[in-house]
Amino acid sequence: MGLSRKKIFTWPLLLTGMAVVSTTFSSCSVFNFFSNLPTTTDNNNYGPTVQNLSAFLPTSDYKKIYDLSFSLEFNNSGGYNPSRLMSNNEGVTAENVNRPYRVFGTGWLFDWQAQPVDENDQNAKWTGYFATNLHVAEALLNPLDNKNYRPAWYKNELPLPGVDQTLYFNLGKWDENLAVQNKHNPKSLTYLPLSNLPKTVYTATSFYKESPKWITPIEADNPGIREYIDFAVLSITLDLSWTMRNGEKVHRYNDEYQLYNRWIMPAMNVAKALWDNKGVLNQPATPPNKKEEDDQLTDQLPYHGFFDRSNYTNPNVSLNNFSVYLGGYPYYANWPTTPQYTKFSVPSLSRRQIPITSDSRGSPGWTINALNPTELDGQKIASSTSLSSTGGIRAGIYNADIARNFQLVYRNVKYKQYGYGYIIQNSNLSAGSSGSLALTSNNQALGIYFGTVSVDAKKEATFGLVASLFNPNKIQVNVVTGNNVFETDTIQPYDLIYGNDLMTDDYGSYIRSLQTLNLSSRLLTKIKDNLPKKEGSTNQANQQTNQTNRSTDATKKDSSSDETNKNPLAELLSDIFKNLPNWN
């Protein structure tokens, strides 16, 4: 890495969330975390990978994550792919780059098309938007992907022979009662190659209008490097089309229709409840962020909605009054009780030959961050770790900005991880779990799981790292960058879902990307419905508008600025930031 400064200790960041499998290897990405703060590591937080519960489905908050979460499997051809060779973290060499390989990850549904599925439409389709990690989305090599995210080396929508591409994509889910069955019927559906490849809707890369200012060691090693957060959104489409035969409705892809009813419908129901954040399902067990009796500050309650937008970097906002639930699909090699997923061939109408295969080394298995069936209350934020103390923000929160080698290659461009996240105890879910939803006991998404750290090749941390998707305020902390040398590290406000005025108008956030790609979305529709009404609106409509959530971005510019007035999209989004939707 060309390091020229003294290293006091080294933490390799192990991106355990992604499993890459070929005919010869299975490996995870290893990064280094360097700090010049003289301290020792917390031995209590390191050890063998946590033995979390697998193939276990409790009826608690973990059930909500289960309903929302899916196993993602990308089956790629191998071949020319400069990103893989540039990454140097998958065991890829010039000798094996042409071999077929598979990449596993986890994704969760949080939004979907605006219009409900019309059962009377013979060409019916359903499209959902699934959150996952950027380093998982990197494995999607769809020649028909949205132009902004299609690999540049394709040059057109039909890559030449010898170029790496995704041949087919499997959507999977653990079925507690039917995980090991081989009969081809809807009840045993656990892993299905879909008739359409996913597409990329959003990646958290270069999302600011101006490049962040990095501390000197990082800027010196990587001049001009841009920012990323390990978050992406993929669109997954199910073909629900049908025709009449002998007086009966026959679906073209019956398995996808069954998948929609068996998996997607429950996922949408849970997501709707979390967005509403009301009713018995969504009442926290204890009042969130309860202040001490002698604390004169006002309680800061979470915003209503799917995502937790509380400012947990504020030391006056408690990190102790909620638990964090994680559930994902780690890949297990030689796992003693390996779940062998049933795999079906895509019907012949897809015109792709998809083999029915079984991997003796294992398949992804549903796993949660619970150590035994009697302790299902989630895990707390690990407040006593050197990882958070070196970051300077507060105990329990890591600072990705100063993690010198928290880097990633996406589409042959190297990025540096930005922002901050949470350190969750006993939450190392191992390979394949990248992209898992971190749900709090307040029934909101705290962020997205992407990995853990390791002090050496054999000693991983027991905690997991969850990237924050939201930073409401400018954060400035002093960090040590050399012997008796201090610098100010600044993390600007960001909001990966809604965006803010510091972020680009086209692809800076999920909502802005939807607008740019001209895609429909239930969330986007609700946002528009909650925008202030034009002249002539009734008092009732105005009152309804006044009840919407307000953005907490302190750096927001005046919406009447020249730049905003010249850009219709920016004008619309400027209203969105100030009028976040009320889901009641």
UniProtKB/Swiss-Prot annotation:
<feature type="lipid moiety-binding region" description="N-palmitoyl cysteine">
    <location>
        <position position="28"/>
    </location>
</feature>
<protein>
    <recommendedName>
        <fullName>Uncharacterized lipoprotein MYCGA2980</fullName>
    </recommendedName>
</protein>
<keyword id="KW-1003">Cell membrane</keyword>
<keyword id="KW-0449">Lipoprotein</keyword>
<feature type="signal peptide">
    <location>
        <begin position="1"/>
        <end position="27"/>
    </location>
</feature>
<dbReference type="Pfam" id="PF01732">
    <property type="entry name" value="Mycop_pep_DUF31"/>
</dbReference>
<comment type="similarity">
    <text>Belongs to the MG067/MG068/MG395 family.</text>
</comment>
<dbReference type="InterPro" id="IPR022382">
    <property type="entry name" value="Mycoplasma_peptidase_DUF31"/>
</dbReference>
<keyword id="KW-0564">Palmitate</keyword>
<feature type="lipid moiety-binding region" description="S-diacylglycerol cysteine">
    <location>
        <position position="28"/>
    </location>
</feature>
<keyword id="KW-0472">Membrane</keyword>
<feature type="region of interest" description="Disordered">
    <location>
        <begin position="530"/>
        <end position="570"/>
    </location>
</feature>
<keyword id="KW-0732">Signal</keyword>
<feature type="compositionally biased region" description="Basic and acidic residues">
    <location>
        <begin position="553"/>
        <end position="565"/>
    </location>
</feature>
<feature type="compositionally biased region" description="Low complexity">
    <location>
        <begin position="538"/>
        <end position="552"/>
    </location>
</feature>
<dbReference type="GO" id="GO:0005886">
    <property type="term" value="C:plasma membrane"/>
</dbReference>
<dbReference type="InterPro" id="IPR022381">
    <property type="entry name" value="Uncharacterised_MG067"/>
</dbReference>
